Amino acid sequence: FIAMVLAQDTDFILLDEPLNNLDIKQSVSMMQILRRLVEELGKTIIIVLHDINMASQYADEIVAFKDGQVFSKGRTDQIMQADLLSQLYEIPITLADINGKKICIYS
C-alpha cells in the first residue's frame, strides 16, 4: 500500500494501524520506511498506533488518547514521562533509556 500512497503524492499521509498483523521485523521495516518518507520527501505522516514503544522510537510528536479524548499531546520526549504514562494507562510505568530513546517497562 505504500506505493499507492506515494503515487498520490500528497503532503499528508494518514495511516490507521499500519502495523496491525505484522511481526516485529516487518513492523520495524514499515516504520523505517515511513520515517524515510518524512526525512527525505518531507511528508507529514499521522499514524494510529497502540504500541507506545514503537511510537517513542519513530515519532516526532505523540497525541495520547484516553476514553476517546485527547489526554496529552506534545513532542515525544514530553509524552514519554513515567508519571504521565502511568496516568494514561492506569498501571505503573517505568522508563528505560536505550540509545537515547525512552522505552516503557510495564510493571
Regions found by a protein language model. Give the residues of each.
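Catalytic Walker B motif of ABC-type/P-loop ATPase nucleotide-binding domains
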Residues: 13-17
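ABC ATPase nucleotide-binding domain "signature" loop
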Residues: 20-22
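Helical segment within the ABC ATPase nucleotide-binding domain
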Residues: 27-40
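H-loop/switch region of ABC-family ATPase nucleotide-binding domains
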Residues: 49-50
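A short, surface-exposed alpha-helical micro-motif characterized by mixed small hydrophobic
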Residues: 55-57
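H-loop (His-switch) and adjacent beta-strand-loop-beta switch element
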Residues: 62-75
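ABC ATPase nucleotide-binding domains
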Residues: 86-107
